[in-house]
């Protein structure tokens, strides 16, 4: 998985480097698919290795630090692009070549300087879905649906309803990254302190308020504040990953990470198309649908135990899909 992660990053960087050389529709389709394959395979393996390598009591804070580092890199990239294109006047072709080339060099350096870390357990080499992970699958699906409301329609609202320019939206992105840089590690520590159940309940209640407010807001500054808060809630999704880490068999992590990405993207493919039709006739209704998604997530989150473990995956077991009698890890909590 470690080698595959680096190969995926290299593939993404190659796609970025080639983008400037294909400034036409079919060419951009091909380079975007190449970048997307590299990105999505890397993110899947990244989640898998993080959950395997990092101890359960350290994982929330570590994932918060990961988000902070990603935000720092995004801010650095924004600043570099602005400086190189506005002050030095470099072309799109050179910009893409430079970004992809630097990324590829970094991947090679990482390949050379990091040792091959040992795997704590042998991972399944095939796709699997377990009945006792049903709650995690459900949370993952609605998380994908919620992400599309933010990525597609909240941004579109800022432009269409409030007349935000490219520069205004870019500034909002930078504020989002700055907030993540500051608060994501703190959110990770907070999740470790209060537990996955309370963290996700707070997130989904907050999202219901944000989505309903999107539908009602008339002030562009309040809308911008909602946009930043909405993005900050993404950091609380750390709790979903640590919930999986606590309930999953160690050898299931890699396969379950792949399955969860697939489930997440079922919503990512379907939701924008369906709600795009709704947007044409009633944009506010899109955000009420988003609030409904958040409500479904909230109802699911109430079924997370206070101390989830293998054998104690859910609070109520109406469908007999979880809490199977299983050997309990002597190093873990009893799940009471």
Segments predicted by a language model, with ranges:
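Transmembrane alpha-helix termini and helix-breaking/packing motifs in multi-pass membrane transporters
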Residues: 76-95, 155-156, 270-286
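Helix-to-loop junctions at the C-terminal end of transmembrane segments
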Residues: 1, 85, 183-195, 279-280
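Short amphipathic helix-loop junctions that connect adjacent transmembrane helices
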Residues: 152-169
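C-terminal ends and interior cores of transmembrane alpha-helices
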Residues: 10-24, 205-218
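C-terminal membrane-cytosol helix-exit motif in multi-pass small-molecule transporters
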Residues: 100-119, 300-305
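Glycine-rich segments within core transmembrane alpha-helices of 12-TM secondary carriers
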Residues: 63-79, 263-271
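Cytoplasmic membrane-interface "Motif A"-like loop-to-helix N-cap segments
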Residues: 1-9, 193-204
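Cytoplasmic helix-loop-helix junction between adjacent transmembrane helices
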Residues: 33-70
